[in-house]
């Protein structure tokens, strides 16, 4: 059978190879580095709740049994803690799975979806995967600009993604502004509030989105267990109106949350003492790191997350790339963020006291060199 070169093997549909693959933060230092401090992925420096660890151990003997495909007990635990209705919750293999399912379900070729220019990179990936057009809106002072987002809405707009707080900047939108964004959207446009870092925010003008979801038919809120110590378990969840829950349940995998994740998640979200310890640790060291970095002459974007965006001088000797190489050689792994539009900045997760002090000491020496 004669074939043209294009027919010699399966090929992805149009547009797939135009997608830039997501590259996670690195996790290894060069060979010979005695101790590695991974500060590149916004993980919880206190680790998992001891109760979650024990719950994961207990389920090990039952791993031959499929998990509950609805994750009912996990949904009930989430509902109990947050004062929600369990039937309005869907659990997922990380919150990014939910983001992908929303794009898959509500976008089609020819549609548009909006996000801000420095937002979580997976939005663009999932929008393109659905065959839709990604529309990146300029930010103002590294914050979402609500007027600019509303101005970007066209008859083709179907989804607006808002990371609140945003990664990698750590900035947030006061909830009155979120409500203004929602009020300005056509009712058929879905507003996705990605509140992955909500646990860490202690501001009177911030809300994760629960009340807006309750009162609207076109708003969902997504959350994650990663920031409370279960990044490796991959647990996300969405709170949404029932008509959206129904649609997503039709396309999600039948056993998308595994048995270990379900049991660990139930224990973790009910261990409020561990969550509060995590938040207190973060508040203390986020403030300290911000002050120390500023004292070194580095600009820091004000953050309410569990990380800092640190901006470096323009001179090549003390650039972000040079700083990253210097820190990595000493076992401190930070995140380069060129792909987010910050070629001369590094994102640093708030770590343990030892890690935080070590990075500041290393940068002090680096900047004097």
UniProtKB/Swiss-Prot annotation:
Its EC number is 2.6.1.9. Its cofactor is pyridoxal 5'-phosphate. GO terms for molecular function: histidinol-phosphate transaminase activity; pyridoxal phosphate binding. Transmembrane segments: none annotated. InterPro entries: Aminotransferase_I/II_large, HisP_aminotrans, HistidinolP_aminotransfase, PyrdxlP-dep_Trfase, PyrdxlP-dep_Trfase_major, PyrdxlP-dep_Trfase_small. Coiled coil: none annotated. GO terms for biological process: L-histidine biosynthetic process. It comes from the Bacteria. The keyword Transferase applies. Pfam families: Aminotran_1_2. It is an enzyme of class 2 (transferase). Keywords: Amino-acid biosynthesis, Aminotransferase, Histidine biosynthesis, Pyridoxal phosphate, Transferase. Homodimer. Belongs to the class-II pyridoxal-phosphate-dependent aminotransferase family. Histidinol-phosphate aminotransferase subfamily. This is Histidinol-phosphate aminotransferase 2.
């Amino acid at each position: 059978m004669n074939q043209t070169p294009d027919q010699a093997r399966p090929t992805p549909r149009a547009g797939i190879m135009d997608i830039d693959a997501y590259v996670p933060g690195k996790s290894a230092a060069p060979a010979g580095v005695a101790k590695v401090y991974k500060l590149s992925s916004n993980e919880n420096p206190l680790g998992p709740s001891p109760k979650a660890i024990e719950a994961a151990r207990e389920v090990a003997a039952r791993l031959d049994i499929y998990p509950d495909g609805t994750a009912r007990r996990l949904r009930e635990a989430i509902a109990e803690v947050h004062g929600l209705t369990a039937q309005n919750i869907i659990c997922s293999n990380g919150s990014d799975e939910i983001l992908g399912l929303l794009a898959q379900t509500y976008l089609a070729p020819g549609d548009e979806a909006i996000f801000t220019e420095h937002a979580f990179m997976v939005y663009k990936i999932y929008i393109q995967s659905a065959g839709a057009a990604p529309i990146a809106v300029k930010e103002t002072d590294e914050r979402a600009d609500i007027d600019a987002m509303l101005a970007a809405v066209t008859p083709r707009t179907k989804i607006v993604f808002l990371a609140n707080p945003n990664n990698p900047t750590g900035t947030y939108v006061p909830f009155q502004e979120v409500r203004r964004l929602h009020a300005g959207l056509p009712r058929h446009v879905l507003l996705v509030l990605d509140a992955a870092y909500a646990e860490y925010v202690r501001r009177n003008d911030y809300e994760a989105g629960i009340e807006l979801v309750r009162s609207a038919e076109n708003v969902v809120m997504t959350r994650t267990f990663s920031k409370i110590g279960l990044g490796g378990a991959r647990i996300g969840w969405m709170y949404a109106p029932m008509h959206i829950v129904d649609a997503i349940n039709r396309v999600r995998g039948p056993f998308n949350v595994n048995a270990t994740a379900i049991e660990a998640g139930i224990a973790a979200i009910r261990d409020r003492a561990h969550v509060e310890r995590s938040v207190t640790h973060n508040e203390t060291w986020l403030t300290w790191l911000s002050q120390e970095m500023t004292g070194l002459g580095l600009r820091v974007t004000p953050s309410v997350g569990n990380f800092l965006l640190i901006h470096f001088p323009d001179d090549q000797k003390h650039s972000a790339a040079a700083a990253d190489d210097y820190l990595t050689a000493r076992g401190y792994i930070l995140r380069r963020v060129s792909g987010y539009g910050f070629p001369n900045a590094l994102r640093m997760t708030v770590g343990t006291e030892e890690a935080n002090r070590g990075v500041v000491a290393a940068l002090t020496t680096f900047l004097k060199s």
